[in-house]
């Protein structure tokens, strides 16, 4: 689950991580009141959306008066901001962070991520702050330093000091930087984060180390024990189809193609998308119905897939282990009737009760194309949507 920058800073502040003073605003008048509450003569007006690249897209403004704060707020609120992370449709700005301006002396990058190679949390940092860390990793990977953290003991202060010296934090501020990183790690672990990025971490002219920006993502599987974090959820920033899918315990991610996919199991779902692309098609979604799908779940999955206007055909690829093929077949038939499906539909069933499942499809009298294998199914749906 993603949260807004200002919410991330609220979380970090509780762990002793230094952040600029700021307030959220939903209207231009609220923006002015927020500026009046800050003891600063320079203000930063920042669009709050769940995407990076806001600065380059014009979503971050520097105001030198409260009149400018109001003008920028009126300009940004309601505007659709398009960044490299939003996609071409962009995201509408519905709230702003009004923050005190900082005298920035130097920018750095600090982040915590889960590293699959080591199965541990890794602290990453770079002297190249303020730019996309992916660009740094691609062009100058030697400028990124890492510390692998032992989960038995957690981040140690000597590791944080090592990082601080490696990215050339001024010696007199290393103590502050260590405190910053230790607090960031504590927030990461206690709040079940999957990513915590500070870009940039800044050293200010008056000798402070603070987070100028903060990106925190959380493990959705752990939200049952993070009620305070769950309250930060902003449904306006999420895909309506993904919200609807979550109501039925369906794992759905919207993509840019035109072939809707309904599969059981994340691995099979990814393989299905790969083989569709292999045969020249483009998947419209990732949709995992899980191991305990019912006819109702299958029907809702169809409705969600068809709510995407780009979908020109559907490929159902099921391997029945815990899930029975006849149950899926009944769900497919019921869903096809309920939604009045007119698009091409290819179904591949394999596993438990597969013969019964195929018989249900054949006896339905519906225009359903059966496939004998995943490759056969992918080829058929790709040819049908062309």
UniProtKB/Swiss-Prot annotation:
Its cofactor is Mg(2+). Mg(2+) binds at residues 199, 213. The keyword Transferase does not apply. Residues 9-244 form the ATP-grasp domain. Its EC number is 6.2.1.5. PANTHER family: SUCCINATE--COA LIGASE [GDP-FORMING] SUBUNIT BETA, MITOCHONDRIAL, SUCCINYL-COA SYNTHETASE BETA CHAIN. This is Succinate--CoA ligase [ADP-forming] subunit beta. The gene is sucC.
